[in-house]
Amino acid sequence: MRFLLPERSLYMNITPKQMLLYAVSDRAWSNSDEEFLSQAKQAIKSGVTIFQLREKHTEYEHFREIALKLKPICKQYNVPLIINDNVKLAKEIDADGVHLGQDDLDIKAAREYLGADKIIGVSAHNVKEALEAENGGADYLGSGAAFVTSTKTD
């Protein structure tokens, strides 16, 4: 992750300290919602400083249900909850922010929909995408998976 330039005042919604250990969920490691929530809580208690709920293969209502159960866990430990890709869900549950891919809603529209105080992160796969995200007002950039994951086959 790279933080945007302070002189641009773009990372006012998130601090470098909050980005020390960014967890991205992978439900393939859990057999049930209860097990997933227990694992998420353990990760947060072990030092995760921001948590992205990434549910690529889950129906909206189930995604919402999991997010609503995870939100108080994150709040208890003062860990921002980021919803992957789904701006509507992020607003509906009042999550701390959203992480957008290159094919998702653009940053400006997401910011208008969610509000100026929400965290917006963007995946960038090259310098051009990174600069576009920075100029578009992203609070942080995700630079891709470092390890093989069942949720990111490309």
Regions picked out by a protein language model, each given a short descriptive name:
Residues 6-105, 112-139:
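Conserved N-terminal beta1-alpha1 strand-loop-helix module at the mouth
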Residues 53, 90, 147-153:
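A short acidic, helix-capping loop that chelates divalent metal ions and anchors anionic groups
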Residues 102-109, 142-152:
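Glycine-rich phosphate-binding active-site loops on the catalytic face of alpha/beta enzymes
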